[in-house]
Regions:
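Acetyl-CoA-dependent GNAT
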Residues: 2-69, 89
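C-terminal "cap" of GNAT-fold acetyltransferases
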Residues: 33, 116, 122-139
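Active-site acidic-Proline motif in GNAT/NAT acetyltransferases
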Residues: 69-72, 105
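Conserved acetyl-CoA pyrophosphate-binding loop and the N-cap/start of the following alpha-helix
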Residues: 72-85
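Conserved active-site alpha-helix within GNAT-family acetyltransferase domains
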Residues: 80, 104-122
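Short glycine/proline-centered loop/turn elements that form peptide/ligand docking sites
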Residues: 83, 106-107, 128-131
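Conserved GNAT acetyl-CoA-binding A-motif
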Residues: 90-102
Length: 139
């Protein structure tokens, strides 16, 4: 069973080296949560704290990326466990909510958000086409 833990700089370096596209989504600071099995990272999420504008005027953790790989490990609870760990961090940080954006084509991700209790706010283009959703969990 995978270990879920806070990531460190060496984890970030390993993730970027293995999956170069992540260099664009893993920012400095923030919160890196990793799932590792036998000292191999098999999943991660990265979130950052930001201020929500009026009328809420509180802080949230925005989940910029969540990944589980290899593909055969998906839909087995790793992402759920990483989100649970982030929720613990968010509670300790006393943030208002956890939030993320999910592309409409990412059906398995939408299922994850619904399963873990996140509310769904569709995003529509001016022509009415829905392109994705902001999902959030108020703490």
């Amino acid at each position: 069973m995978a270990n879920i833990r806070l990531g460190i700089d060496v984890d970030r370096t390993q993730i970027v080296a293995t999956y170069p596209y992540t260099a664009n989504v893993l920012g400095d600071g923030g919160y890196l949560v990793v799932a590792d099995e036998n000292e191999q990272i098999v999943g991660f999420l990265w979130a950052f704290k930001r201020k929500i504008p009026a009328p809420i005027e509180q802080e949230e953790l925005f989940i910029n990326v969540i990944e589980v790989f290899p593909e055969e490990l998906r839909c087995q609870g790793l992402a759920t466990r990483m989100l649970e760990r982030l929720k613990e961090i968010a509670a300790a940080e006393k943030v208002y909510q956890l939030r993320a954006y999910c592309d409409i084509r990412n059906v398995s991700s939408h299922r994850l958000w619904v399963k873990t209790g996140y509310g769904n706010n569709p995003v529509a283009l001016p022509d009415g086409n829905i392109v994705g959703s902001f999902v959030s969990l108020v703490l």
